[in-house]
């Protein structure tokens, strides 16, 4: 073990292969192995969770038994307690996550409010920011699926794509501001391909009804 900073690895008993750098880094670690914690109070409450990596002030601060987490950026995964296999890359990523596992957030504020949602992927500033319990969502782009809270199985690619969806499930939004209007806030099983927040996208589909509308001419 290597400890640098006041109270770093302070409570360690049998844990091995740990690195704590910074005031109270890995302070409560007792038996956990192979954790790396760099930053003020990073992984401060970890006791038996192992194979975690934290870089930044308060990163993984509340983690106790969670394993295989990676938090890079101030406040990243700071509320995580027992959840595992999460990756937070950037300032304020996955801040409110407690027990949600297998989430990946890259970009400032991505998946900020996620608590118990699982298997979400957010790439971009504030992508899936308001998600709390929704699972199996993928948001790529600035504020993609930003307002989603409980909706699941959604895919959004593009700036503000699906940005007003809140509880809708199994939607696909592709393009700049695709589906970024209130008519899609709670919709399910929609396909929207557009380059604006129009209610008449170039391609408008419904997976459940197996229908597809093309708002334009099809040419060979």
What would you call each of these model-derived segments?
Residues 1-219:
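Glycine- and small/polar-enriched repetitive beta-structure motifs of secreted/surface proteins
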């Amino acid at each position: 073990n290597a400890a640098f900073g006041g109270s770093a690895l302070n409570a360690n008993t049998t844990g091995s292969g740990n690195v704590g750098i910074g005031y109270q880094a890995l302070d409560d670690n007792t038996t956990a192995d192979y954790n790396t914690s760099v930053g003020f109070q990073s992984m401060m409450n970890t006791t038996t969770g192992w194979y975690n990596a934290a870089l930044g002030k308060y990163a993984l601060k509340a983690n106790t038994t969670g394993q295989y987490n990676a938090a890079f950026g101030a406040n990243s995964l700071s509320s995580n307690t027992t959840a595992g296999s999460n990756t937070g890359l950037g300032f304020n990523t996955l801040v409110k996550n407690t027990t949600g596992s297998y989430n990946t957030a890259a970009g400032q504020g991505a998946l900020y409010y996620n608590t118990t949602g699982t298997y979400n992927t957010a790439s971009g500033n504030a992508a899936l920011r308001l998600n709390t319990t929704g699972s199996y969502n993928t948001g790529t782009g600035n504020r993609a699926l930003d307002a989603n809270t409980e909706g699941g199985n959604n895919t959004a690619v593009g700036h503000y794509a699906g940005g007003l969806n809140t509880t809708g499930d199994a939607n696909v939004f592709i393009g700049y501001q695709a589906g970024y209007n209130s008519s899609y806030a709670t919709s399910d099983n929609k396909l929207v391909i557009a380059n604006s927040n129009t209610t008449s996208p170039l391609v408008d589909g419904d997976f459940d009804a197996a229908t597809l509308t093309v708002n334009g001419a099809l040419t060979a």
